[in-house]
UniProtKB/Swiss-Prot annotation:
Enzyme type, top EC level: hydrolase
EC number of this enzyme: 3.5.4.25
Name of this chain's protein: GTP cyclohydrolase-2
BP terms from Gene Ontology: riboflavin biosynthetic process
Originating organism: Shewanella baltica (strain OS185)
Function according to Swiss-Prot or TrEMBL: Catalyzes the conversion of GTP to 2,5-diamino-6-ribosylamino-4(3H)-pyrimidinone 5'-phosphate (DARP), formate and pyrophosphate.
Superkingdom, natural source: Bacteria
Pathway assignment: Cofactor biosynthesis; riboflavin biosynthesis; 5-amino-6-(D-ribitylamino)uracil from GTP: step 1/4
Keyword check for GTP-binding: yes
InterPro entries linked to this entry: GTP_cyclohydro_II (IPR032677), RibA (IPR000926), RibA-like_sf (IPR036144)
Catalytic activity: GTP + 4 H2O = 2,5-diamino-6-hydroxy-4-(5-phosphoribosylamino)-pyrimidine + formate + 2 phosphate + 3 H(+)
Binding site for Zn(2+): 54, 65, 67
Alphabetic keyword roster: GTP-binding, Hydrolase, Metal-binding, Nucleotide-binding, Riboflavin biosynthesis, Zinc
Cofactor, how bound (note): Binds 1 zinc ion per subunit.
Length: 204
């Protein structure tokens, strides 16, 4: 994998003005983005998140997942902290792509869970790769991270690429009656670290 830095621009948001850094994977043609806020330290832990693209949750306000809620919460947390980053990776549908994600949703509408749906389509439960995070973090000057995630695979990926994860910061937001089963599957079958908050019934 060859990641090339392309350009940086300002990105005004409801939480403040971020910097948007564009990257291209010259082998696959995929385009990735790093958002940064404030001054990032190479010596001190920086609050950050690895976020995989989710068109339905991030842009279309879907309640089937917690992705959009997590993205907004991460941006707000970073702004309130005063500095931080988000690596926005173009890996829709845990790496299977948008149309296959819609096919998986169709199977879920018929009773399959999120893992079963992927497997019925001939995919692994999670097809995402994280090779691009090292050159992206090198470009923005981050070596030590307070990582906002519930996913142990992201913690492992950072450590494998020589990035110190000083702290895992839970990001448990967005539970609702449409995604309760999905969240439970992420916990029980994909190993995501979640508290009982996600399994209470107050929003039914």
């Amino acid at each position: 994998m060859s990641i090339k830095y392309v350009a940086t621009s300002k990105l005004p948001t409801p939480w403040g003005v971020f910097a948007m850094h564009g990257f291209e994977d010259t082998e696959s043609g995929k385009e990735h983005v790093a958002l940064t806020f404030g001054t990032l330290s190479a010596d001190e832990p920086v609050l950050g998140r690895i976020h995989s693209e989710c068109l339905t949750g991030d842009a279309l306000f879907s309640l089937r997942c917690d992705c959009g809620f997590q993205l907004q919460a991460a941006m707000q947390n970073i702004a309130e902290t005063g500095s931080g980053f988000i690596l926005y990776l173009r890996q829709e549908g845990r790496g299977i792509g948008l149309l296959n994600k819609i096919r998986a949703y169709e199977l879920q509408d018929k009773g399959a869970n999120t893992v079963e749906a992927n497997e019925q389509l001939g995919f692994e439960a999670d097809m995402r790769k994280y090779d691009m995070i090292k050159p992206m973090l090198e470009q923005i000057g981050v070596k030590h991270v307070r990582l906002m995630t519930n996913n142990p695979r992201k913690v492992k990926a950072m450590k494998e690429f020589g990035i110190e994860v000083v702290e895992r910061v839970p990001l448990q937001v967005g539970k609702n009656r449409y995604n309760e089963a999905y969240l439970k599957t992420k916990s029980t079958e994909l190993g995501h670290m979640m508290s009982e908050y996600h399994f209470m019934d107050e929003n039914k």
